[in-house]
Each structure stands twice: as C-alpha cells, then as structure tokens.
C-alpha cells in the first residue's frame, strides 16, 4: 500500500499490537532435515483456524532476495518458495484452511501504479547498468584491476517484472504450487484434514482482495463460525486496514520483522563496506577474503500484528464524550480506516498537506473528534461515505493548510541544519586526532601498521540511545570511507598485523604504505545531497497558483477545474472504500491525474453523487501485460505482441516511452517522485490488440484466460468421498458444498479436467533434490467458486452475532490494585502462557555483568545518568554514598494512558525479591515486583527507594528518563 512508514508509525504508537512469533526449528539427523511436526500444539499458545498467504509477498523475496545470493535458476526459486510456505505453516499451523492467493489481473486503478513501478524499475536498472559500466571504465583507465563480467550471470539475470499475471513464469509457478500441495497432502499429517484453496494468477484480482472477498462471502453464510481465528501473511500496510474492515473477532497478521539499514554489496566488485562510487575495483582479497567485511547472514524472524489489540487501542483513541448519537465502535473503526486513505493508498496520491511522518493521521483523528459533534454522525456506513460530512472534515483541514506548509518548511530547514552539523562532526570524528588511516580517537603517536596496529576499540557510549549511536556510527563509517578509504586501510592494517612473522617486516609495510598514500584531504562540507529546486514553495503566499500552474498547467482561478479534480479524487475515495468493504465496484475506473488537489478545494464535494452501476470486467492477463510492461520486459509477451511495443509503425508506440520524466514533487530521491507516464487509453489498446489475437498459440491462449480457484483435500479428509464422486462424474455442473464436512467452508465445486486423480503418480515439475516425484498421489483437486450473492447485495460491516471478544491486553483505565488486585498483562497471545524467569542467582549475575559494564561505559558518578552504583546494587549499598535506582528493572511511563507494555513475562517471570534500603540506612525489607502503573510518575515494574541510578532495563522504542532513576515509582521516566 502506498503509505510509506505507516507500519512503523502504527507499531510505535501502539506497541502492544506486535508479538514476536515463536517457532520450532527443523532438526538435522544424519545430514537430513527432519521437518517440524505441525500436528503438535502451536508454540505461540494460540491455535489458528485459517491461514491466508498473500503469495506475491513470498514470491518476490524468494526470487530476487536482497539479503543473500540470488537463486541460480527457476527450480531453485520454486524450492525456496516451498520452504518459505513450510516455515509460515509451521509457525501458524492452521487447523481448518490454507488459502494461497497470487495476484491476478488488477483493476485499472491499481494498474496505473503497477505500470509506474515497472517502468521505473526498468529505468533504474538501465541507469544502474550504465553507472556500473562507467565506473568500470574509469577504474580501467586508472590502471586498476576490476572483476571480469560473468557471462553466465548476465544471461541468467532475473527480470522481476515476470511476476505479473499472464507470463510463462507465473504459469509454471502455478503448476509447481499444485505439485507442492499434492506432495504435502500426501506426506505431511498436518495437511491431512485441512482444505487448501489455490487462487493463481489467472484468477482476476489482487491477492489480498481475493482473500478479503472469500472472508466476506463466508461471513454472509449462516454456517460461518463467528469465532474463527484468522491469520494473514503479508507485508503490505493495507492488510492492517483490511483486517480491521473484516470486523472479525480474532484477526492477526504475520510478517517478517523489518530490519532497517541492511548492508548491501557493491554492484561492481560484490564486496561490502562501500558504495559503487567508492569502489576501488579489486576482486575479493585472497588473504583477508570477502568474509572479513561481509555481514553475518541471519534468518529473518517473524512477528504477529494482532488486530484485536489494535482495536483496543483505537477504542480508547476514538472515544468521544457526550456524543449527540450513540457510540458504535465498529462505525468508528470504519471511519478511522477511511481517514487513513487520505494519507496514501495504492490508487490515489496523498493530499499535499498530509504526510504520515508529520503526524497526519493524528491530525485527522483530532479534527474528526472535534467535528463529529457538528457532523452529528459517522463518516461511513458499510463502505459508503457520507460526502457532506467528508466535506466538513476537508473544510476544517483546509483552514490549517497554510500553517502545515509553513511548519513543514521550518522543520525541513532545522533538519538540514542538524544534518549539516552532524556531517561536520562525523568528518572530524572520523579523522580522529591522528592522520590518515587511524581509528577513531587513535592517538597520533600510535603507528597505523605493524604489530602495534590497534584492533577495534570498545564503543564509547554517550547518553544517546542505541538507535542514535548506530546512526552516528553508520554515518561516521560512510564519511570515513568517502574521504580516507577506511576499509582499504583497515585491511592493510590487519594484514600488517598478521604478516609480522611473514615475508615483510613492519618497516617494509610502512614504506609501501607511504608510497601508496595519497595527499591527505582537508575536511570539506559538500552539499552532495543537494536538495532539488522547489518552484512551488508551498510555504509562501501564492502557493496554490504556483501548484496548479506547475502540476496541471492551469491557473488557480479556474475554479471549475479545481472542483473537477476534487470530485475525481472524492470519486476515488468512494471507489477505494467500496473496494475494501464490498469488493471491486468498477474494473475500469481510475484517477485520471498524477497529482492530488488541496483539502481547501473540496468545497462542493457534498453535492457529488458517485455512480458505479455500469457493469465492467477485468482485462485478460496478456492485455494487462501490454498495459503495465515497459518495452524492456517484452520477452514475456508473444512475439507478435512484442512488436507493438518497439516498432515505430505501432498505433500504440506512444504508450511505451524509452525515457520519461520523474517529478520529485518536493522529495529528495527519485523513488519518491511521480513518474509522468501517459495513461493507457483502454479502447485504443484493445482495438489494436485485435489484430494480434489470431497469432496466439494454444499455450498462450490458456495463459490469457480467466481461470478458476481450486480446492484440494487429502485422502483422510472427511469430504474425500464426496470430492471423488464429483471428480469421477467429469461434469462441469456446479455442486453445493456441505459446510459441515468442510470446517464451515461454503461454496460450489466442479470437475477439474487438469487434475491428477488420486492413486496415480504425480511427476514433479521442479528439478530439485527436495522435489521428488510422487509415486502415489493421495490428494484430490476440484474447481471451487465462492458463494454467490445478488448484484446489489451490501455486506454489513458489523461484528457477527455470537462473536466472542478476544481477551483484553491493555489495562483498563479504571483498574485499581487495592480493589482489583495486581494486573496481570497478556504477554503474547495467551495470558496463561508459561513465562520465563530468573532466580536470584541469575539476577545477580546479570546485575554484576550488565550493570558493571554500564557503569564502566557511562563513567560512574560523573555521568548524568546515574549515581555511584545504580539499580539493584545501589539499592542495598546506599551506605557507601551512591543513591541507587530502585529495582533491577526500571520501566517507563507513558504520558498517554494505557499505551504501555509490560515485558515482565519475557525476562523477569514471576515476582522477584530484592532488598530495598533507604539512603543511609542499614536495614531493608523484601519487596515484590510491581506491575506497570500509568498513574504514577515513574514507570518502574519494580518499586525501589529514591535514587539517581540508571533507569534500569531499556527496550526500544522506550528510553528511561535522564536524571533520577526510573526503577522506583518516584523516579522519572519518559516516552520517546
């Protein structure tokens, strides 16, 4: 979804929504991998009924990974996809249904974004290749050896644009997935009693929306279990909105944990530690090896995002006192989803005044809560917005647009000044007090070679957070590399240290080094990241005139045009909301502009009446390829169709520009800009394609058809006999399913002429050691259709009768410990899940090592963070003069109630005892671990005496307060 930073913003504001996924790892026995037994209870102490896979989020990282070497061939890609699905399956362990959805042909509104992405990717690839070749020629001209081009790698280059419906790759992937399902149904007991639905690329619709359509249509059937536990796998931000829009009682999202700032290898030499423009061209050093600077490859972890917990947060956030109408949480949540669309989505550009990094969603929610008394009702109902109320919200936002733009400019100027100052500090810091090649802070009298060459020193911590220190270190390293060739020098230093007993002496090394060394460069603050020229200047008067003149080539005094743009935008909002709540209302609608209007232009949208009653249908797969592909990806199309992209005589050659302009639109990087591509003229395209349709082969015709969903079960499933009867009938007539035999699944099935019958061998289409032929197929496959509803049916956006609310995670605002007892927060999915803990000896061990190291790094009494011996030690040793922080683990205090998380279950376990002493006193009393309390100044889990010790345990994104210790309830902690 087009909301950059949305997931980061949401999880930072609502931290308890995220739970780390526990998983059982595969074991190796005698060199063979032993698969995880997924019939065992779920390691996350939560049993899931249905698992949905948004397959494109799996296909892309498996076919062209960014954190490991690329697969050698297509078969290896398929094997990696199977392995990825196995891993997700072993974490979630669905007990009823597995639904695999691959992106099919998308609506026109989405196709415009797909077109922009693919053309932009093609342009960036060409520019990168040109940059690599230019750097190669420059290094060769300087007499520097460069790695030779590897012909086999060039020929095997994988074009990720082939992950689009209608390509041969997607057809082969569908065949491979059918084999994979039959293999697992035959050999894995955990698959024996579940249903598997495969919606491949020939089924129209985006993967996540095919999943939502399935859930909506199952909810409308009386046989649906309202307490079904859902889990959807995918990384798109819009999955969060879709999860809320289902109104299901227990909906969860599983995704890879995002690790920012991952190192990438140089495109020319393949080594780490520098960028292309800093490459010196040499092959991997034969002595040190690439492993010297290559980062450790770690398997990515998975996290769950719990929609029920997000609902708890939003219930508190959307609470409004003294409403003139009855509060309805489900309607309020739908309004929250709708307001998020203004910040960005895949179908509309975001409003110029709304940037998520500037708190746009918070601003909209605040405005909504202020104006709801004037609106006297909600913004939406069942996915249909009330446009007169939308106009009121936009009118309120339009009044503060001037202020937003001016504040944005002030913030940007302040940020640029801070970055400039930081760069100056980093340059000075990178040089240290010595000369070229010395480590940070290395004394000038220490030689940078030979046996006295220093190894890396321990990191010196300041009072800044770990994240800030990491950022500083990265920038220091980058600047040091750019000015002093730090990586090459560090390698030379290490080789000098290792070669002391070798052929060269330290003196010889020093002599060689002096001959190689270039003139030392002065510290220069360059504006290498110079900001693009801003001709709009939204922060100055006349901004609207300049904006419309530059972006639309009209004057702002053309009120009718501004209203047309605003009406088209509102029509898009109506389309998007229906898409999320009712399904695709029009396959051919799209927003016909590259830029959004201003909020102050929504003056008359209350009068607008959108109409989506005209029947439409999706493109065929090959027609979509012609709509979204650049000419550089033409190899995935039939030969005669390719010519329409490249030949000058083609009637549609203008749709495939070799180059195009990217408007940065106030941004810094090209990927953030707007690709100014011509919109596809649907009628002209389809009319032109009629001339090449007769040239299609049978295989190409099959790839160009709209296909059905397929449902699979195993021989041990209780519906196997019924499915076999349908398959043996070889009839195309649809037969109703019995939900009681399929875990509540409703719909219709019919014979699949392409399926392999049970009992027959199933040859593997994948040439890989992990993908062997099946001697006897034990699965059965038939075609599947969702339940049907009338054309004008409206799916109600409500909580179903009989749905049980998930167990609360956040502490109620009216909780009183004296009255209600100690609050036991939910850690993970289950409040009663076993928790790890430490005995007293373990606590002492941690205190001794961690606190001791903290004291050493922070400088003891002189550091602003703490007293002589803070925390646990300071608690019982106050007589020695230090005013220690209270408990072993300090906590945090959220100034906004109920946004806190209790991490006691992960590290601390049950009640922990220690001795609390008053300053100067020699006596003490045992004190139990106390829960987090938001109504006290200190956020500590443990109550202790007053003190100035370290704030205790810190967990991002929270930082203990500076100054007095956060361990005790009288210490100060802060939300960061």
UniProtKB/Swiss-Prot annotation:
GO terms for biological process: miRNA catabolic process; mRNA processing; nuclear-transcribed mRNA catabolic process; regulation of development, heterochronic; regulation of vulval development; termination of RNA polymerase II transcription. It is an enzyme of class 3 (hydrolase). It comes from Caenorhabditis briggsae. Its main location: nucleus. Its EC number is 3.1.13.-. Possesses 5'->3' exoribonuclease activity. Plays a role in maintenance of steady-state concentration and turnover of microRNAs (miRNA) by degradation of mature miRNA. Degradation role is enhanced when in complex with paxt-1. Partially redundant to xrn-1 in miRNA guide strand degradation. Implicated in differential regulation of mRNAs such as let-7 by controlling the accumulation of mature miRNA. Positively regulates molting of the pharyngeal cuticle. One of its GO terms (molecular function) is RNA binding. Residues 411-420 have a biased composition (Basic and acidic residues). Residues 411-442, 815-976 are annotated as: Disordered. Keywords: Exonuclease, Hydrolase, Metal-binding, mRNA processing, Nuclease, Nucleus, Transcription, Transcription regulation, Transcription termination, Zinc, Zinc-finger. Interacts with paxt-1 (via N-terminus); the interaction is direct and results in stabilization of xrn-2 in the complex. PANTHER family: 5'-3' EXORIBONUCLEASE 2, 5'->3' EXORIBONUCLEASE. GO terms for cellular component: nucleolus; nucleus. Residues 535-788 are annotated as: Interaction with paxt-1. Belongs to the 5'-3' exonuclease family. XRN2/RAT1 subfamily. Residues 856-866 have a biased composition (Low complexity). A zinc finger (CCHC-type) spans 264-281. It is found in: Nucleus. It comes from the Eukaryota. This is 5'-3' exoribonuclease 2 homolog.
